[in-house]
UniProtKB/Swiss-Prot annotation:
This is Mercuric resistance operon regulatory protein. The keyword tRNA-binding does not apply. Residues 7-76 form the HTH merR-type domain. The gene is merR. Keywords: Activator, DNA-binding, Mercuric resistance, Mercury, Metal-binding, Plasmid, Repressor, Transcription, Transcription regulation. GO terms for molecular function: DNA binding; DNA-binding transcription factor activity; mercury ion binding. Residues 10-29 bind DNA. Gene3D superfamilies: 1.10.1660.10. One of its GO terms (biological process) is response to mercury ion. Hg(2+) binds at C82, C117, C126. InterPro entries: DNA-bd_dom_put_sf, MerR, MerR-type_HTH_dom, MerR_fam, Tscrpt_reg_MerR_DNA-bd. Mediates the mercuric-dependent induction of mercury resistance operon. In the absence of mercury MerR represses transcription by binding tightly to the mer operator region; when mercury is present the dimeric complex binds a single ion and becomes a potent transcriptional activator, while remaining bound to the mer site. Pfam families: MerR, MerR-DNA-bind.
Amino acid sequence: MEKNLENLTIGVFAKAAGVNVETIRFYQRKGLLPEPDKPYGSIRRYGEADVTRVRFVKSAQRLGFSLDEIAELLRLDDGTHCEEASSLAEHKLQDVREKMTDLARMETVLSELVFACHARQGNVSCPLIASLQGEKEPRGADAV
């Protein structure tokens, strides 16, 4: 890890964690990141553990976890709750698979509509517009 990640101001901390200051404040409001003590007449300081925590949140977001799910994963981060964490990941994996199925269905419908648009001849209404207006449902559109 980078050297000297202790005693950081919020700006330096945000940069080290790869986010902006508003993201830090947002995570604090959401309870994902504790707000450090503010010594009298001083400014709050952050350390390596805070940087690691923000990176954890960002990594989990990239995998599709919601902030509520990330809060739950953080709660489980003592090394003894692997089964609970695995269960959360299994649910997320199922969600991802369902979304992929939906996206594949949408791709098929859109592909058919684009083909129909390119294949139309004469003064026929646009198949895409007609489909969206409900005049003619493309195959599989009711599932989208």
